[in-house]
């Protein structure tokens, strides 16, 4: 398994990966038809200083997963990395790949952006596996957005706001 920055050469594989993950109605927020070439191209722009993106490949170079996040553009919030999305291809889920990818991503965030003090994300309240993963990485539940997410069947589910915060001493101890 290799974790590395995404490159423009990954665009087609990223498109296929995100579309495969979007087939699960309880997975990522985007619907399959919202996973477009333009969307994937926008992810490839999440490179320093505006954001960070990593992919994980197997020994044969096949893309198994991707994670990305971006900084807020307003100066009062530039210490925050937000919009975190992690995807692992359905064939590779449940094998620790997402946790390894996310762990490396957080190390890279600390190294690349020493001024980041907060990494934030949202998860469906019903996505217990994701909530457990995020908590195992140190994220804390900060609140609930009632009925924020509309499911494909028209029903609504709460979203859980989560964050991982760093202090000045964390920069040197992790």
Question: Predicted regions span which residues?
Answer:
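C-terminal "cap" of GNAT-fold acetyltransferases
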Residues: 82, 124-126, 147-174
